[in-house]
């Protein structure tokens, strides 16, 4: 249906980069994957280290050619924020036709395309008011970057987004990683009764110097 809809007009996409590497964080750490990074985002987090506004227009054919040049059959759709990309379902259908396993990295505020096999969401505490109103109800994993107002935000996300795995990740503030604060909060969260257990997720790709 989607292929027929766009038969006479193949959409182009804002692509920051496409590369093959190892997943560096979360449940699938170490998994060889092809990363397709889309431009633009619907949030503006002050600590974001992703150049999501530095993109070029790629055709579907160009994207497929690049992705097929790598050996991995796992694709991570990331950004920016991929759920705001117009006509992304068309591209995802092409990936599925090629037999790829599709994971998405999203902030969790917009609906997830049906073609996605695995959802990793990273809710942002700066926008807690948005998650109180509406967000995705389920993810395979939740990864939250440790910044401020975290205990109450973690509890909010537990209520809003059901997940198999919940992770906290430290972030760099004024040139220093807040690892101590992160593991301290992990201990507090995991002392609660009948609540989800949280785990530590590090950006291991940065620690070992890969993309």
UniProtKB/Swiss-Prot annotation:
Q: Which UniProt keywords are listed?
A: 4Fe-4S, Iron, Iron-sulfur, Lyase, Magnesium, Metal-binding, Queuosine biosynthesis, S-adenosyl-L-methionine
Cite the binding residues for Mg(2+).
Answer: 50
**Oligomer and partners:** Homodimer.
UniProt: S-adenosyl-L-methionine binding residues: 80, 122-124
A single GO molecular function term of this UniProt record: carbon-nitrogen lyase activity
Q: Iron: present as a keyword of the record?
A: yes
The UniProt family comment states: Belongs to the radical SAM superfamily. 7-carboxy-7-deazaguanine synthase family.
EC number(s) in its UniProt entry?
Answer: 4.3.99.3
Catalytic activity annotation:
6-carboxy-5,6,7,8-tetrahydropterin + H(+) = 7-carboxy-7-deazaguanine + NH4(+)
**Entry superkingdom:** Bacteria
Which cofactors does this protein require?
A: [4Fe-4S] cluster; S-adenosyl-L-methionine; Mg(2+)
Its GO biological process annotations read: queuosine biosynthetic process
InterPro entries registered for this protein in UniProt: 7-CO-7-deazaguanine_synth-like, Aldolase_TIM, rSAM
Q: Which organism is it from?
A: Haemophilus influenzae (strain ATCC 51907 / DSM 11121 / KW20 / Rd)
Co-factor binding comment:
Binds 1 [4Fe-4S] cluster. The cluster is coordinated with 3 cysteines and an exchangeable S-adenosyl-L-methionine. Binds 1 S-adenosyl-L-methionine per subunit.
Task: Give the metabolic or biological pathway.
Answer: Purine metabolism; 7-cyano-7-deazaguanine biosynthesis
What broad class of enzyme is this?
lyase
- Give the protein name, as stated in the record: 7-carboxy-7-deazaguanine synthase
What does the entry list as the binding residues for substrate?
A: 22-24, 37, 78
Pinpoint the Radical SAM core domain residues.
28-211
Which sites bind [4Fe-4S] cluster?
A: 41, 45, 48
Role noted for this protein: Catalyzes the complex heterocyclic radical-mediated conversion of 6-carboxy-5,6,7,8-tetrahydropterin (CPH4) to 7-carboxy-7-deazaguanine (CDG), a step common to the biosynthetic pathways of all 7-deazapurine-containing compounds.
